[in-house]
Amino acid sequence: MKQSKFLSLKEFVVVLLLACVEAAIGLVVTMPFAANLQLVYFLAPGLAGLINGIIYVLIIKKCPKIGAQFIIPAIYGLYFLFTGSVYVFIFFMILAVANELIMLGGGYQSKIRSAVPHALTWMLNAMGSTLTMLLFRDSLVESYVAMGMDATSADAAIASLEGFWLAPQNIAIALAAAAALSIVGYALGMKMLGKHFKPAGVA
């Protein structure tokens, strides 16, 4: 019997649960750094990618099928939707589709190609606020006004944040850190796959 290219119901549930674990880890990792904008931008996304690399490897080895890559960013994006960050949710949904396309045509057979969606997910996590300010600045100002600020104060508040979130050097550092740590996490997951997961029958 030919194996389906798409997730079965059981595999869907497995991926869904592991994706929820990834999202939870991503949120928990950020909490200790919440008071420090620099650490939230430069360290937290990469640290989440480092830890979640192990979970990600479990997902792609247990369920290397169409749908798995969509679920991971989609679940994380839903958190942002529920907290009111609609634009960040949209970014993650676009990434969910892109990650699926990246893995089509035998992507799961390539160790290098398999690492790309994981790195992109946590790089986007680092860029959520940056992209929102860059693409939807006027909407952000309007949201501040809706909360009771006058237009001038709202514009000044956004401008003060832009100096940090949109600085080219800060963007480069955040992307590089997220990518590097995510790849290290993926490599760690692959190492654990051979030493622990396969012998234990987990993957």
Q: What is the predicted function of each stretch?
A:
Residues 1-4, 193-203:
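Short, charged juxtamembrane terminal tails flanking transmembrane helices
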Residues 2-71:
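Hydrophobic transmembrane alpha-helices
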Residues 2-10, 36, 40, 44, ...:
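Juxtamembrane/transmembrane-helix boundary motifs in multi-pass membrane proteins
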Residues 12-17, 46-47, 69-74, 89-90, ...:
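Hydrophobic alpha-helical transmembrane segments
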Residues 18-29, 48, 52, 56, ...:
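Alpha-helical transmembrane segments of multipass membrane proteins
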Residues 30, 34, 75-105:
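Interfacial aromatic-anchored transmembrane helix boundaries in multi-pass membrane proteins
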Residues 92-130, 186:
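Short helix-perturbing small/polar motifs within transmembrane alpha-helices
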Residues 118-194:
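Membrane-embedded alpha-helical hairpins and interfacial helices in multi-pass inner-membrane proteins
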